[in-house]
């Protein structure tokens, strides 16, 4: 009976039902010494979170909590975990049917949301691959049935399916290589995308021979596909970071540092292109228009861009490549040839200094083009210029709506660069020039983190951390500001646990003031939007989330952090943070023979 009473107390602390928050009181600043973290309690807390999801209004948040809880329960109560996963999958299917993936707007930029069906499948695959495969087969069958009732194919849906399958495959690489490759193979039924090359490079870092073998399977699958799809297989054999064609979607691939190109794969790929060229020459009317340019133009681009590498590694094929390219050229219009040569020329434009770019921009009579070029010069070519010189150029931009976002972007990047060079004073000085206070506070937190890594004395470390709190107090309530405060709380755990708890309380207050606070996205978008051009980049803000910092402090102060988690006004965030604390308890109980979650201070 006593044990049951104690569990009930813990559940009330966690505020598992939709009712009342216990956070009306002043935040605690003293560390509780009570040891109440026990294995059975942690499991009870997790199961209460599953029950609490029934009160959520947002299906996406409900799915997130169910998946997290099921993942934690699997090793302890598999039947309950399966039930939670099944509920999450049913909700995800309903959510997708009603809303699809959904799009979020960042100015003029649209950002696609996650497909929660595959989020659930991804998590299940870590525990039961066969079950996850059955769920994928179920989705693909439904997709096929739906497509058969439509007069035209949904090409975009097919691409997204391939991307989702490859995302699952990538997540499984370190856990179950065979399962990973199985999911990757299932993607070959759908159009190739840049996700395929990204998977190949990631897989090669785990098992190069397996990745090379899968490449051959992919090449066979896409041998007769439109050139803009086949050319997604152009980068991997040569170890290139870009595709050789004009692709529907493109990126710069992260090639593993120790990656070694495979001449055999290079030969197979070049021979495939030569076969396609010959087919075109034999039957010029049998070509695919392509999303951007027709197949023959894609062939010409690929053979031209890979020419030097082919001469170096496959000299015996170089003559055939030259003949093939000439054959394609002869069948292209003069206008197409000019456009293609222009594309090749833009691959490696002549290098111009910052001042040369500025001078050229200022001569342009079109004010919008001039502003665009000046902005580009500041962002991408001013690395070695003095701050004062760059500021003089920014002043020449006509559109006042561009100047301040550009300055924030410039000083943010300069501060980060100084931080990488361990010039902490310069980094702080530059950060003060960032007028977006939440981003300034985030920069301060990164500077403090690096300084503490290098054993800065506690007095200066405390000064830096308090500077962040002061800057955050003046900043608008955003997830960037909240992450900065969370960073301070985390960093304070190294020097002053009481202060860590107090700052954690401030972070929670900040989060509660943010409408629809979402910490699942590990980046924020910064943007410059002129009248006729837009530029976007992401700031990576990963590492500091409410659940991770609360769990970190819970290793010392379980009861207090469980109480702090109850203060979140958002039900799903309250549940996610509580689950993270319970997970910490499970790990501690397992490693410490249920001695609790305290550690020496």
Predicted region positions:
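N-terminal secretory signal peptides that target proteins for export/translocation
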Residues: 1-5
């Amino acid at each position: 009976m006593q044990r049951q009473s104690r569990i009930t107390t813990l559940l009330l602390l966690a505020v598992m039902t939709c009712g009342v928050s216990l956070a009306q009181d002043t935040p605690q600043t003293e560390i509780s010494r009570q040891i109440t973290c026990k294995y059975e309690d942690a499991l009870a807390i997790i199961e209460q979170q599953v029950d609490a999801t029934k009160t959520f209004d947002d299906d996406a948040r409900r799915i997130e909590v169910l998946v997290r809880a099921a993942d934690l329960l699997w090793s302890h109560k598999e039947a309950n975990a399966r039930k939670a996963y099944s509920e999450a999958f049913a909700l995800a299917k309903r959510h997708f049917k009603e809303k699809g993936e959904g799009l979020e707007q960042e100015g003029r930029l649209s950002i696609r949301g996650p497909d929660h069906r595959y989020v659930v499948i991804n998590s299940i695959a870590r525990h039961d691959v066969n079950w996850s495969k059955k769920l994928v087969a179920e989705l693909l069958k439904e997709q096929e049935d739906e497509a058969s009732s439509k007069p035209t194919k949904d090409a975009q849906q097919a691409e997204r399916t391939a991307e989702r399958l490859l995302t699952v495959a990538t997540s499984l690489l370190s856990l179950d290589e065979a399962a990973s490759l199985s999911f990757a193979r299932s993607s070959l039924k759908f159009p190739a995308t840049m996700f395929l090359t990204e998977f190949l490079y990631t897989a090669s870092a785990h098992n190069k021979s397996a990745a090379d073998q899968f490449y051959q399977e992919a090449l066979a699958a896409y041998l007769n596909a439109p050139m803009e799809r086949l050319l997604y297989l152009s980068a991997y054999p040569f170890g290139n970071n870009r595709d050789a064609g004009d692709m529907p979607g493109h990126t710069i691939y992260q090639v593993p540092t120790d990656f070694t190109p495979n001449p055999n794969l290079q030969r197979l790929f070049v021979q495939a292109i030569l076969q396609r060229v010959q087919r075109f020459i034999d039957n010029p009317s049998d070509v695919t228009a392509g999303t951007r340019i027709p197949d023959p133009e894609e062939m010409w681009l690929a053979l031209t861009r890979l020419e030097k590498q082919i001469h170096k590694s496959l000299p015996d094929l170089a003559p055939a490549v030259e003949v093939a390219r000439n054959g394609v050229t002869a069948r292209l219009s003069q206008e197409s040839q000019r456009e293609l040569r222009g594309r090749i020329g833009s691959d490696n434009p002549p290098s111009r200094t910052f001042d040369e770019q500025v001078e050229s921009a200022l001569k342009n009579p079109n004010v919008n083009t001039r502003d665009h070029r000046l902005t580009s010069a500041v962002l991408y070519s001013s690395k070695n210029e003095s701050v004062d010189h760059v500021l003089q150029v920014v002043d020449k931009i006509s559109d006042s709506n561009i100047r301040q976002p550009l300055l924030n972007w410039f000083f943010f990047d300069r501060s980060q660069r100084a931080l990488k060079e361990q010039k902490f004073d310069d980094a702080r000085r530059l950060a003060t020039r960032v007028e977006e206070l939440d981003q300034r506070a985030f920069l301060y937190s990164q500077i403090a983190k690096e300084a503490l890594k290098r054993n800065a004395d506690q007095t200066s470390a405390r000064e830096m951390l308090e500077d962040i709190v002061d800057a955050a107090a003046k900043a608008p309530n955003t997830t960037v500001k909240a992450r900065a405060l969370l960073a301070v709380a985390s960093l304070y755990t190294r020097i002053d646990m009481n202060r860590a708890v107090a700052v954690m309380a401030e972070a929670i207050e900040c989060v509660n003031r943010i409408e629809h606070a979402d910490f699942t996205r590990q980046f924020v978008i910064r943007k410059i939007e002129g009248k006729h051009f837009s530029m976007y980049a992401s700031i990576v803000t990963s590492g500091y989330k409410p659940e991770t910092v609360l769990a970190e402090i819970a290793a010392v102060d379980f009861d207090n952090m469980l109480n702090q988690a109850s203060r979140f006004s958002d039900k799903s965030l309250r549940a996610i943070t509580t689950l993270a604390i319970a997970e910490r308890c499970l790990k501690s109980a397992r490693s410490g023979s249920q001695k609790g979650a305290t550690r020496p201070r």
